Amino acid sequence: MEVIKVGGEVLDRVEDLARVIDDSILVHGGGPEVSDVMERMGLEPRFVRGLRVTDRETLQVVMMVLAGLVNKRLVAELRSEGINALGLSGVDGGLLIAEKRSEVVDGEEVDLGYVGDVKRVNAELLESLLDAGYVPVVAPLGAGEDGTVYNVNADTAAGAIAGAVRADRLVLLTDVPGVLEDLDDPETLIERVRPEDVEELEEKGIVTGGMVPKLEAAKMAVEAGCREAVITNLEGLLEGRGTIVR
């Protein structure tokens, strides 16, 4: 069984995605869609180390776009390709119990607002859906014990889920072939990364921006019991290429 994290851009390539779904749990992002709606509402998207700063207004947009627009469109497209997809968010059924995330940048704590870390995963819920023949499609929201809803980075959510269900593989799809030493040169792909190497790659500046939560999610999943994680794009997944974390 594998956990696949996809971005909103995959909505235009669902036919290709359907080819690789087999005993899978999908977790989707939707960052560009969220930013687009925010800008139309006069809100400025802000990011710290690849994580969206989420105040109350931004959280409302995130909930609306991820749990509504992106999730339901992806489920509908997958079902049209013969995939028995079932959409839910991390709030539903206590799937993702979250707590406020604290982020330290240059030695100082940065308040990200309603950004959450996954504290606990309801693995039994996902396993029951898989046993019933469904492909769970998860929008990355979580809720605290007090009912506070949090925006959970999709890579982080996928990593936590992969570890909790002890998946054979976590696939983190992105728009590049994997972790690159030079972002402008696909030939500089780093094919293998050990979990203990992740911090060093960040400190050297090889891994920046949105790749930071991807590598950290891969590390978290492998250390929690997932056999391996792969960071790649859809072409790489179809062709068996990418960065393997194991």
UniProtKB/Swiss-Prot annotation:
Q: Name one Pfam family in it.
A: AA_kinase
Supply the EC number(s): 2.7.2.8
Q: Which UniProt keywords apply?
A: Amino-acid biosynthesis, Arginine biosynthesis, ATP-binding, Cytoplasm, Kinase, Nucleotide-binding, Transferase
Where found in the cell? Cytoplasm
Q: Where is the signal peptide?
A: none
InterPro entries (alphabetical): AceGlu_kinase-like_sf, AcgluKinase_fam, ArgB, Asp/Glu/Uridylate_kinase, Glu/AcGlu_kinase
Can you cite a GO biological process for this protein? L-arginine biosynthetic process
What residues form the membrane-spanning segments? Answer: none
- Its EC top class is transferase
Q: Quote the pathway field.
A: Amino-acid biosynthesis; L-arginine biosynthesis; N(2)-acetyl-L-ornithine from L-glutamate: step 2/4
Domain of life assignment: Archaea
Report which reactions are catalysed by this protein: N-acetyl-L-glutamate + ATP = N-acetyl-L-glutamyl 5-phosphate + ADP
Taken from the UniProt entry, a GO cellular component term is: cytoplasm
Family that this chain belongs to: Belongs to the acetylglutamate kinase family. ArgB subfamily.
**Annotated HAMAP family:** ArgB
- What does this gene product do? Catalyzes the ATP-dependent phosphorylation of N-acetyl-L-glutamate.
Could you tell me what this protein is called? Acetylglutamate kinase
- Source organism of this protein record: Methanopyrus kandleri (strain AV19 / DSM 6324 / JCM 9639 / NBRC 100938)
Give the gene symbol.
argB
